[in-house]
């Protein structure tokens, strides 16, 4: 229970700061009042199981989705999920299409200069995925230098690949990157 409370408090920090990313002078109280007055927390989310995905009935489920639901419940409001294009997350916040982004996010300078962020609640890593039957061929950084990588547009993975000078095909979702590998 203490861990859930800590997670909810961290999420409140994200909500209270990211909900009005273009107006940092607004207080957490006014952001909270804004959400409670309208009765709905609008959450920007992407489709990437197991963190966020829609089940057979179209309901958003997964670690992030479930945490967002619990947080909205603690505020006494409903939650509405809006699937966003990851590369447009800052625009979505600034235009108030969404109140917050609830998703794994690498804290790049672009992200931290555009919105307030909570402390991390999980740690992820960048990985290279290749077909299983080719994995033995790609064991070193040197062995992948001539590959073309698929990465979600606007992601930390895309930025890192570009910084390293690799050939990158931007895709609209992480699941699309996986489909490129499978093709």
Where are these regions (language model features)?
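Solvent-exposed loop/turn segments at secondary-structure junctions
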Residues: 48-51, 87-88, 106-110, 134-136, ...
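Extracytoplasmic small-molecule ligand-binding "clamshell" domains
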Residues: 26-104
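Short, low-complexity disordered leader/linker segments with a strong preference
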Residues: 1-39
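Ligand-binding "clamshell"
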Residues: 109-122, 166
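Ligand-binding cleft/hinge of the Venus flytrap
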Residues: 53-57, 68-77, 141, 154-174
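Flexible hinge/capping segments at coil-to-helix
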Residues: 131-148
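Short, well-ordered beta-strand segments
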Residues: 42-46, 129, 147-151
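Short helix-initiation/N-cap motifs at beta->coil->alpha
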Residues: 80-92, 136, 154, 169-183
């Amino acid at each position: 229970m203490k861990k859930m409370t800590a997670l909810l408090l961290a999420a409140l920090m994200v909500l209270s700061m990211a909900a009005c990313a273009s107006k940092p002078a607004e207080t957490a109280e006014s952001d909270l009042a804004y959400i409670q007055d309208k009765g709905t927390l609008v959450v920007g989310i992407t489709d990437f199981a197991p963190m966020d995905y829609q089940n057979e009935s179209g309901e958003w489920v997964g670690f992030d989705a479930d945490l967002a639901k619990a947080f909205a419940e603690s505020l006494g409001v409903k939650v509405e999920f809006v699937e966003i294009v990851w590369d447009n997350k800052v625009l979505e916040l600034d235009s108030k299409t969404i109140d917050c982004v609830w998703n794994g996010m690498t804290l790049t300078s672009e992200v931290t200069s555009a919105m307030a962020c909570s402390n991390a609640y999980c740690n992820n890593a960048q990985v290279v995925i290749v077909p299983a039957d080719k994995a033995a061929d790609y064991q070193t950084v040197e062995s992948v230098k001539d590959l073309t990588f698929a990465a979600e547009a606007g992601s930390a993975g895309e930025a890192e690949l570009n910084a390293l000078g690799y050939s990158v095909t931007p895709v609209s979702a992480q699941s699309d990157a996986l489909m490129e590998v499978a093709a």
